[in-house]
């Protein structure tokens, strides 16, 4: 809260820091996992990704990110609505990004993300756990591998390996 202002209203500690590191996930067919003796598996219902381009110059609304495209798509493909989601692990390069992505993925109406986050228990045992491992804001962004930390945490949760922060 007391870190220096970088660009109003953002302060230095509202932004993700660069860090060394990496992360990875191994994906394979179920038959291969069984052959290897892997019993703890996760099966995705839907998948989508998007890379945001030069938003400042090419997007008329700077509060819109690629999540406004992929969020509704993955929910639609999985035949789900935001209210059906048990936890949310969005890319969090800035503190306000979680608010925008909550709106764009259908958890809150546009302009109501801040109130939604204030009114919702976001902890591991809460009504909508968000970035239960702390997200990038807590550990940094290792270059282009940054978004993977949230995916790794989501998979840990789904596999029941969240330890003290395990979502029920």
Residue ranges: model-predicted function:
Residues 78-89, 112-115, 131-140, 159-165:
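Hydrophobic alpha-helical bundle architecture
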Residues 2-73, 121-128, 132-133, 137, ...:
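Condensing-enzyme catalytic core mediating Claisen C-C bond formation in acyl metabolism
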Residues 54-62, 92-115, 123-126, 142-145:
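Short glycine/threonine-rich loop-to-helix capping motif typified by GTGT followed
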Residues 144-168:
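C-terminal amphipathic "assembly/sorting" segment characterized by alternating charged
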Residues 17, 66-86, 97, 158-161:
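Conserved active-site "lid/cap" helical segment
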Residues 15-19, 89-90, 143-144:
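Active-site nucleophile and cofactor-binding loops and adjacent substrate-binding regions
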């Amino acid at each position: 809260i007391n870190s220096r202002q970088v660009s109003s209203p953002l302060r230095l500690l509202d932004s993700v820091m660069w860090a060394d590191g990496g992360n990875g996930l191994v994906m394979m067919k179920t038959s291969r996992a069984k052959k290897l003796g892997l019993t703890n598996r996760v099966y995705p219902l839907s998948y989508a990704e998007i890379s945001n381009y030069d938003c400042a110059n090419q997007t008329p609304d700077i509060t819109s990110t690629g999540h406004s495209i992929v969020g509704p798509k993955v929910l639609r493909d999985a035949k789900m609505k935001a209210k059906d989601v048990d936890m949310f692990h969005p890319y969090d390069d800035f503190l306000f990004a979680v608010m925008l992505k909550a709106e764009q993925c259908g958890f809150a109406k546009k302009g109501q993300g801040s109130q939604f986050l204030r009114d919702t228990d976001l902890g591991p045992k809460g009504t909508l756990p968000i970035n239960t491992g702390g997200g990038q804001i807590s550990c940094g962004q290792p270059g282009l591998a940054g978004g993977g930390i949230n995916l790794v945490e989501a998979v840990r949760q789904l596999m029941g390996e969240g330890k003290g922060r395990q979502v029920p």
